[in-house]
Amino acid sequence: MANIDLKAEKGQEQLNELLANKSYLQGYEPSQEDVAAFNQLNKAPSDKFPYLLRWYKHISSFSDAEKKGFPGIPTSASKEEDDDVDLFGSDEEDEEAEKIKAERMKAYSDKKSKKPAIVAKSSVILDIKPWDDETDMAEMEKLVRSVQMDGLVWGAAKLIPLAYGIKKLSIMCVVEDDKVSIDELQEKISEFEDFVQSVDIAAFNKV
């Protein structure tokens, strides 16, 4: 069949490429050319040739009687012209198929690139303990909020009683995981050593 051996993997690969954007070998309905190729294959091709496998399953769904009723392969005006017919498409058709494939891939890539990237964020509650009950908690909160990092947003805060009149500062923040290291944030807060005794993570949740 047009010098293509469909029992060889190379021939099956060529036919698979041809069927990438069409349902039948010729035109918009099955023909005797489909039957001839089907018979030459003799068995279902590997699933690494998805278009060929789809076509094979479709042709195999027809009965022998139905296959005999398929129209014959179009004949040329002369034997010479017939010999020149490439039953599996011309180079121009291959180029057109490649062009369509390239356009589809470009459209997919453009669509994917325009899709906004998902920014992974976490909601964190920090418990910050002072040294004693004489620590100015309002000033300590002010110092904590003065810590600025790209991807860090401070939220609500409240004072929670501990013991002996001592209160801890419980403060919430939202961080972008790729930009903010919680360990680094804790270290920066701990630098206010005149106010801060310890910094602990009370809660950590993905947003």
From Swiss-Prot:
One of its GO terms (cellular component) is cytosol. It holds the Pfam family EF1_GNE. It comes from the Eukaryota. The modification Phosphoserine is found at residue 90. Residues 70-96 are annotated as: Disordered. The modification N-acetylalanine is found at residue 2. CDD domains: EF1B (cd00292). Disulfide bonds: none annotated. Transmembrane segments: none annotated. Phosphorylation affects the GDP/GTP exchange rate. Keywords: Acetylation, Elongation factor, Phosphoprotein, Protein biosynthesis. SUPFAM superfamilies: eEF-1beta-like, GST C-terminal domain-like. GO terms for molecular function: guanyl-nucleotide exchange factor activity; translation elongation factor activity. PROSITE patterns: EF1BD_1 (PS00824), EF1BD_2 (PS00825). Residues 80-96 have a biased composition (Acidic residues). EF-1 is composed of 4 subunits: alpha, beta, delta, and gamma. Belongs to the EF-1-beta/EF-1-delta family. This is Elongation factor 1-beta.
